[in-house]
Amino acid sequence: MSTTSKESLVCNLRQLKCHFTWNLIAEDESLDEFEDRVFNKDEFQNSEFKATMCNILAYVKHCRGLNEAALQCLGEAEGFIQQQHPDQVEIRSLVTWGNYAWVYYHMGQFSKAQAYLDKVKQVCKKFSSPYRIENPALDCEEGWARLKCTKNQNERVKVCFQKALEKDPKNPEFTSGWAIAFYRLDDWPARNYCIDSLEQAIQLSPDNTYVKVLLALKLDAVHVHKNQAMALVEEALKKDPSAIDTLLRAARFYCKVYDTDRAIQLLRKALEKLPNNAYVHYYMGCCYRSKVHHMLNRREMVFSGDRKKLEELIQLAVNHLRKAEEIKEMLEYSCSFLADLYIIAKKYDEADYYFQKELSKDLPPGPKQLLHLRYGNFQFFQMKRQDKAIYHYMEGVKIKKKTIPQKKMREKLQRIALRRLHEDESDSEALHILAFLQENGGGQQADKDSERGVDSANQVPSASLDEDGAEY
């Protein structure tokens, strides 16, 4: 193929609406992270999205240099389109054909790439456009792809489904996608609007169990219609007790309403289908960890000799969290939660190992602060290493993000400093801590006449093994 012909081919390929032109992988995201998020998170694991998932998988296979495998995935996508959309095969196949054209282009098989471009062109010409048309089915497919693949494009997703609804306002699939996009946007626009959109989607798709559970979660979040929320979840589970995305969201609902036993029951069902899914093991571990802390809060149970039950729960939590960590090492909080459980079990070497592992991760500011708070507490209370506790509290305060953990670390540092000054007015480390607090956003000056300083002198940092991510 001549240079001019190749440039023309590329120009036409760029006009296609398909996964190769939608910029689905964020610039700061690795292919491994992208693939894990797309194929292991809980949304859209069910049969109605098989064609969509095959197209996404084909794109991932190509990115990994597995073009033959990509072609096989596209062939499977064509088969699912014919099964699920027999009345719209041509329109629904445009994205798949576009992906075919791009894969063959990258394989150097330009004639085959052109053949698929021609197939797209034949359909688009019916709408007076060479390679790109405005069609609600295409907007819908782009919306599902972005909803599944992207992290921060929910506004763009909403626009895709909104465009589709302008042409077909009562379409159940478009309405469901639009409602899910609003759910993802969470607090903006107002939650009542999100609830309205989910209710509208259910009216048009009464069998959509996933949307029912999303509505239940939203109703619970705004603290209204608790009975309706519970009824929606039970109805969804009765209608389709094996749908993975419904099971996982329902488990999340039961966690939020403090029914961890029911959540664990649903997660066990999910594990039967996804035995090596890190996220399901992680959620299971978190549920068992929640039961551990609930039992610890009921101190009379521990003191009355029910230590064996506590140890069993700790081991179940550890087993699932370790399994999750083995499958996917970068899960947020997994190592911190393991460290927490080992502290409760008084296995401090194991706890320190997982704290160190978590510290080695590249965490966002909020989780990093929380980690320094937890590790500082561990050093102060369990290891009796005040120097190391001070170091980690300071490291957490240095992170320029106002959070509850940061506030707690300031308070802990101030109490440590004031207590030391109460014992020795010239304690250089205590004076250094107070100067550090002043330099990093304020703190109490070393003033021996300060009533607050005297009152604080005999206090120590408060201990909390269960200082969770909800704090920041």
Swiss-Prot record:
<dbReference type="Pfam" id="PF14559">
    <property type="entry name" value="TPR_19"/>
</dbReference>
<protein>
    <recommendedName>
        <fullName>Interferon-induced protein with tetratricopeptide repeats 2</fullName>
    </recommendedName>
</protein>
<feature type="repeat" description="TPR 7">
    <location>
        <begin position="334"/>
        <end position="364"/>
    </location>
</feature>
<keyword id="KW-0399">Innate immunity</keyword>
<dbReference type="GO" id="GO:0140374">
    <property type="term" value="P:antiviral innate immune response"/>
</dbReference>
<dbReference type="GO" id="GO:0003723">
    <property type="term" value="F:RNA binding"/>
</dbReference>
<keyword id="KW-0677">Repeat</keyword>
<feature type="region of interest" description="Disordered">
    <location>
        <begin position="441"/>
        <end position="472"/>
    </location>
</feature>
<dbReference type="GO" id="GO:0005737">
    <property type="term" value="C:cytoplasm"/>
</dbReference>
<comment type="subunit">
    <text>Domain-swapped homodimer. Component of an interferon-dependent multiprotein complex, at least composed of IFIT1, IFIT2 and IFIT3. Interacts with IFIT1 and IFIT3. Interacts with STING1/MITA and disrupts its interaction with MAVS or TBK1. Interacts with EIF3C.</text>
</comment>
<keyword id="KW-0007">Acetylation</keyword>
<dbReference type="InterPro" id="IPR011990">
    <property type="entry name" value="TPR-like_helical_dom_sf"/>
</dbReference>
<keyword id="KW-0391">Immunity</keyword>
<dbReference type="GO" id="GO:0035457">
    <property type="term" value="P:cellular response to interferon-alpha"/>
</dbReference>
<dbReference type="GO" id="GO:0006915">
    <property type="term" value="P:apoptotic process"/>
</dbReference>
<dbReference type="InterPro" id="IPR019734">
    <property type="entry name" value="TPR_rpt"/>
</dbReference>
<keyword id="KW-0694">RNA-binding</keyword>
<feature type="repeat" description="TPR 1">
    <location>
        <begin position="51"/>
        <end position="89"/>
    </location>
</feature>
<comment type="similarity">
    <text>Belongs to the IFIT family.</text>
</comment>
<keyword id="KW-0053">Apoptosis</keyword>
<keyword id="KW-0802">TPR repeat</keyword>
<dbReference type="GO" id="GO:0005783">
    <property type="term" value="C:endoplasmic reticulum"/>
</dbReference>
<feature type="repeat" description="TPR 6">
    <location>
        <begin position="278"/>
        <end position="333"/>
    </location>
</feature>
<keyword id="KW-0963">Cytoplasm</keyword>
<feature type="repeat" description="TPR 4">
    <location>
        <begin position="172"/>
        <end position="208"/>
    </location>
</feature>
<feature type="repeat" description="TPR 5">
    <location>
        <begin position="244"/>
        <end position="277"/>
    </location>
</feature>
<feature type="repeat" description="TPR 8">
    <location>
        <begin position="365"/>
        <end position="403"/>
    </location>
</feature>
<feature type="repeat" description="TPR 9">
    <location>
        <begin position="404"/>
        <end position="445"/>
    </location>
</feature>
<feature type="repeat" description="TPR 2">
    <location>
        <begin position="90"/>
        <end position="135"/>
    </location>
</feature>
<dbReference type="GO" id="GO:0009615">
    <property type="term" value="P:response to virus"/>
</dbReference>
<comment type="function">
    <text>IFN-induced antiviral protein which inhibits expression of viral messenger RNAs lacking 2'-O-methylation of the 5' cap. The ribose 2'-O-methylation would provide a molecular signature to distinguish between self and non-self mRNAs by the host during viral infection. Viruses evolved several ways to evade this restriction system such as encoding their own 2'-O-methylase for their mRNAs or by stealing host cap containing the 2'-O-methylation (cap snatching mechanism). Binds AU-rich viral RNAs, with or without 5' triphosphorylation, RNA-binding is required for antiviral activity.</text>
</comment>
<feature type="repeat" description="TPR 3">
    <location>
        <begin position="136"/>
        <end position="171"/>
    </location>
</feature>
<keyword id="KW-0051">Antiviral defense</keyword>
<feature type="modified residue" description="N-acetylserine">
    <location>
        <position position="2"/>
    </location>
</feature>
<dbReference type="GO" id="GO:0043065">
    <property type="term" value="P:positive regulation of apoptotic process"/>
</dbReference>
<keyword id="KW-0256">Endoplasmic reticulum</keyword>
